[in-house]
């Protein structure tokens, strides 16, 4: 049962009674619990976003309702907790972050499952992944050592998909320096970059500037050229293009990442040589993956190899030929002997850096590509090599 005070706050906020307030009103609003962080609380019923002061729903700092609840629970804001639940926030998110017995008891009174901390943590993490709730997950798990320590080692590594993500999570870090807290942060940050979730990326880049170089590396590795363009040209976060190309080549089927490094000035012949030497690197990154995943990875690296040639890499120079012979790759020797088969693609010869134009160009290339690794011709050549 909600108090008259909470119901009154709900009405006042929903009717935007404080959208125009005087400086003299601030103290009164604070005392009445209608002031949160930098201004009067606002709520958009359409998009379920909680705002503060003059911010809009689309601002990086605005809060989706469940995330606002978690924040209020951390701050032990009793009336706000009740208010956010009244608007429809999921109270079980709140109980995960309750720091005091009083706040935990309040969450239970408002409908939280007392057993949730024992039986619901794993499913909640999976739910947040499926719904791509990056900022909510960060709010719940980051710096929540009690919750992180409640997972045993196997469950924790399973949750963050450690086999698949380990390489990118550990960029710039030594194994012994990585805490669960840092791993969870990087997992969700990487998740946002991978799925091009702009608002979470912008929020996290402001909150964790020490990860700016890692963010650029992750964006290159995952082929998120929108984020690479922003970091490189708007935020002046820079790396040597050849170092970036090494990362781009490590991710299967990464045409966007490889092209962007090429357009920034990376040596495309060197990129081809890197890819042809990737057997050991591939094992290092994916050493624990299953057989069917290995097949897709190998196919993905072949696509990268042919794409580099389409960009102008010369497979017939001595350096490349020596690498092929060192690798004892009969398949590559046969393919690269077909000089008319593998050649630069005319669509890709202009170096452009605007992401929207790059997407169009790559799409045109894929629609006009005459040779790709698993075409009937390629399969026939591979069978001959064997």
UniProtKB/Swiss-Prot annotation:
Matching entries from Pfam families are given as: ASFV_360
Q: Which domain of life is it from?
A: Viruses
Single biological process term from Gene Ontology: taxis
Explain the purpose of this protein.
Answer: Plays a role in virus cell tropism, and may be required for efficient virus replication in macrophages.
Q: Which family does it belong to?
A: Belongs to the asfivirus MGF 360 family.
Name the record gives this protein? Protein MGF 360-4L
